[in-house]
């Protein structure tokens, strides 16, 4: 019997936020919806994050209309997901409990199925109220443990050590992340997401965390990452092999680069591994037909230029060259053997073949989320100040 892997599609929220500064209009979303109903994703992230802000600020649209229109089109085929900043909800300052209560109630009544709840500093107190009210009104509370790495402190010199200064003690250990996940599970979380918004987690680390979470927490585990620094696809493969329950992906023309890995590449890996995602890839191909044109429209309206797009690829109808097919096998074998360098190398070669962006060393060093990077690029373009981007990234 084939193992099942659930797929959360991010295209209409994190996908467009990471690659196109969250400027996808309702009319553009509507063009994709008839095919999403047939795609059979476990979940679709469509709301929260920067979507409500951008919908009002830049598009002069109603964010509640966005959610309700998608729910009307998709029904209960896929659970609609939103990203909430804990007590801040979709804003940038904390709200009192009565506001959180009413917001969660209205969200679920408008069609929301899953609320992914996070605090950027992993402060569990800041997610408590949202978990409570989401569950109270019949929603699924998806609590996210935010992945990060320790600051890069220089090793103390000889005289500093003489004065008693010690080496930096690691904070963000496996035990730290597991403890946060356990605290969130104790609050009533229905699932836990390892949320790597900057794409910094390498394959070996995510495999370790997935196994640790699965062993110690009795609820499903989701993995969310980005491809910006060049780990995303390899890390998703490692998470799948380690036994993760859900992975987050984007459709082809909104995938990779600053976004999440492509469902099409994950589909190829899963097929080779004998894993069933339940996703209707014929419907995904129809979504991609729309997204290809929308991508061109957004490149012009957001960035004022046409950006290179990946080679078209439909895993149901296109035959991979033998050497590329062999790279998928090599990546799987390397991930199963815990050969991190070989896994990353094979996955990067796969991405390069399809014309996806090369790893962004600026983002890798600055350690910032892909959505923040794409928004910064768009804002500097608007200000005609693109030349300061490298310096800004250095300062970050």
Language-model features, listed with the residues they occupy:
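Catalytic cores and adjacent flexible loops of soluble metabolic enzymes
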Residues: 1-116, 120-395
